[in-house]
Amino acid sequence: MGRSLKKGPFVDAKLLLKIEKMNERNEKHMIKTWSRASTILPVMIGHTIAVHNGKQHVPIYITDQMVGHKLGEFVPTRTFRGHAGSDKKAARR
């Protein structure tokens, strides 16, 4: 189920404030955020936002196709290391 239309999309207030200030000054530098739940808005297009994945900040360039999605969707939190390999000693027996 989606969020109620009367509430509007969730965006971290500090993140939105930083984006709006950068748009006023026509600046384009990276912004660090821990807010993975923030929705991407049209005012964020063209900015690079470094989203925290639990270990480090991963930079993401925002495009028009990302609008409406959450920041956390584009930064995986888990790394797949592969399944256990075949044990050659066990295979011989």
UniProtKB/Swiss-Prot annotation:
GO terms for molecular function: rRNA binding; structural constituent of ribosome. The keyword Thylakoid does not apply. Keywords: Ribonucleoprotein, Ribosomal protein, RNA-binding, rRNA-binding. It comes from the Bacteria. GO terms for biological process: ribosomal small subunit assembly; translation. InterPro entries: Ribosomal_uS19 (IPR002222), Ribosomal_uS19_bac-type (IPR005732), Ribosomal_uS19_CS (IPR020934), Ribosomal_uS19_SF (IPR023575). GO terms for cellular component: cytoplasm; small ribosomal subunit. Belongs to the universal ribosomal protein uS19 family. Protein S19 forms a complex with S13 that binds strongly to the 16S ribosomal RNA. PANTHER family: RIBOSOMAL PROTEIN S19P FAMILY MEMBER, SMALL RIBOSOMAL SUBUNIT PROTEIN US19M. This is Small ribosomal subunit protein uS19. The gene is rpsS.
